[in-house]
Amino acid sequence: MQNYLDLNPTSVVSGKPYIDLEVTDDYIIREFGQNIDPIELMWHRDDEHRTVEVVESGKGWQFQYDEKLPLTLTPNTTISILKHEWHRLWKGEGKLILKINKL
C-alpha cells in the first residue's frame, strides 16, 4: 500500500493536505499536491462564506456539496460555499490550485 506521508511533506508539517502559497486579508491561494492521500480530503464545513476560483487543475479533481453529485473542476470554475455548508474535494491527477475569496 502507498504511504502518502513519505511523498507529501506538507501534511506532516502543517497537518493539512495543502500548502497556502499566498495569504491576504481578502483571499488565500491554496495548493493541493499530486501526492496527497485522498483520505485527507474529508467532508468539512468552513466558518465563513467563500467563493473559490480554480486557478489550475489536473485531470479528475472534483468538488462536492453535501447530498449533491460531484462537479468536475477546471480552470476558471467558480464555486460559492456558504458558511457551515458541508463540502469536500475528490482527488484527481496532478495538483489543484485554488483562489479562496473570503466574503
Region annotations inferred by a language model:
Residues 82-103:
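Ligand-binding loop in jelly-roll beta-barrel domains
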Residues 2-4, 60:
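Fe(II)/2-oxoglutarate oxygenase catalytic core
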Residues 65-67, 102:
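Short acidic, glycine-rich loop/turn motifs
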Residues 46-62:
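Short, conserved beta-strand element in jelly-roll/cupin
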Residues 67-84:
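Short acidic-glycine-tyrosine-enriched beta hairpin
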Residues 7-30:
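Transition segment at domain starts
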Residues 26-48, 80-83:
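Conserved short histidine dyad/triad with adjacent acidic residue
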